[in-house]
Curated annotation (Swiss-Prot):
Protein name: Female-specific protein transformer
Record flagged with keyword Nucleus: yes
Comp. bias (Basic and acidic residues): 20-37
The organism of origin for this protein: Drosophila virilis (Fruit fly)
GO CC annotations on file: nuclear speck
Notes concerning its domains: RS domain directs localization of proteins to the speckled subnuclear compartment and the purpose of this localization is to allow colocalization and co-concentration of components of the splicing and splicing regulatory machinery to permit relatively high rates and/or efficiencies of reaction and interaction.
GO biological process, one term: mRNA processing
Function, in words: Member of the regulatory pathway controlling female somatic sexual differentiation, regulated by Sxl. Activates dsx female-specific splicing by promoting the formation of a splicing enhancer complex which consists of tra, tra2 and sr proteins.
Major localization listed first in the record, in broad terms: nucleus
Length: 199
């Protein structure tokens, strides 16, 4: 065996396990599901504090007050709420809003992911198909009367069997007989009487 491990001598019969075929985690469904499931556990210890509540500006309010003595809290009827009250209210409002919002968002995404399943749901509805057991030209050709030996040959030639219904775009091609049918003389023909006289 050379130092070059890629070239192996025919004598080298050591069994080596075939290298497992590598597949990215996002292509393997189970691994990807476990990875997504474990993602929240890998979060760093330092957490981002929620964004402080932004001040709400009404549409009709001036973009910024001209004087420093007037703050947005005072603009409503020149009455200043106590700061502790404002802080208390804003904290509770932010908490309730964020918790309900996150809950709503989580439930919506959960329901959306439930709708996306791995195998598409195929809804089968039993639809009655009329006359499914009958072939395309079921009644054709119409039944012919059975042979009755009591009656002799007809005085007129039989018409050919009626043709099958044909809805082709072009004219029906002529029938091609792969093998000639048996020779049947005219039903009124008699070998004894109607034989051609030899000349």
């Amino acid at each position: 065996m050379d130092a070059d491990s890629s070239s192996r001598s025919p004598r080298d019969t050591r069994r080596r396990s075939r290298q497992r075929e590598k597949m990215p985690y996002f292509a393997d469904e189970v691994r990807e599901r476990d990875r997504v499931r474990n993602l929240p556990k890998l979060k760093t210890t330092q957490k981002r504090t929620p964004t402080p509540p932004r001040e709400r500006r009404s549409r009709h309010e001036r973009p910024r007050s001209r004087s420093r003595t007037h703050s947005p809290e005072q603009s409503r009827c020149q009455r200043r709420l106590s700061r502790s009250y404002v802080r208390h209210r804003s904290g509770s409002r932010q908490k309730t809003y964020s918790s309900s919002c996150s809950r709503r968002r989580r439930s919506r995404s959960r329901s959306r992911s439930r709708g996306r399943s791995r195998t598409p749901r195929i809804i089968t509805v039993p639809v009655p198909v009329p006359a499914a057991e009958y072939s395309y030209a079921y009644g054709w050709p119409p039944p012919r009367p059975h042979f009755n030996p009591m009656y002799g040959a007809l005085p007129f030639g039989m018409q050919p069997r009626p043709l099958n219904p044909y809805f082709g775009a072009y004219a029906r091609p002529p029938p091609f007989r792969y093998r000639a049918g048996p020779f049947r003389p005219h039903p009124r023909y008699s070998y004894r009487n109607d034989r051609q006289a030899p000349n």
